[in-house]
Amino acid sequence: MRYTWPKKKLCRREWVNLFGTEKYDLTKSNRAPLRSRKSSEYGVQLRKKQLAKRMFWLSEKQFASYFTKAQKSKAEWTTWEKMMQFLELRLDNVIYRANFARTRIQSRQFVSHAHFTLNWVKVDVPSISVKVWDVISLRDKLKESPLYKSLLEELEEFSKSNKWKVSACKWIEVDSKKLTITIKAIPAKEDFEQILDIQKIVEFYSK
């Protein structure tokens, strides 16, 4: 998904660092968030939806399709919980969550360029939904690539300092030596991206 707004303005609109670099660190900004006049309930719901779309870099069509799938799901989870699970279990999001990429945008680029395998098969579709016990691996030929050198050094430091389990999500297991990610469980409510208010988004689409 491509946005045509200037990057800094987009971050100020949502008051979130969407690009993961120091350049867009809003804690160092002297400027106020871009805010419109007091919003109606519909306006609040719309803003929550826009934030979620921009955090996961999805088009309206893609994002709405996750709501439709969640609404039709006959599981024990609520619609908003199922919707978050669909978002969290995207391949590009899992790679980002495992700290194999600094941002979701970077993770999507890595997947699109076939840098990873899923269950030892090369993949290049960021939206693939992973399942419990799936194994994602960095391809061998890229482990020595300069592109990944700094990232791998960061992973090694995480591992040495015992910060690894904290930095990666509880529902995934990362092997920092083999450079693999194993899906251990379906993400629970406490594992979701906490800044998002998916209930408001469900209310928006339910109208």
Each model region followed by its residue ranges:
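Glycine- and Gly-Pro-enriched alpha-helical subdomains that act as flexible
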Residues: 114-117, 122
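Short, well-ordered loop/turn sites that connect or cap secondary structure elements
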Residues: 110-111, 130
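The C-terminal cap of the DNA-recognition helix in HTH/winged-HTH DNA-binding domains
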Residues: 97, 112-113
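Beta-rich strand-turn-strand
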Residues: 101-104
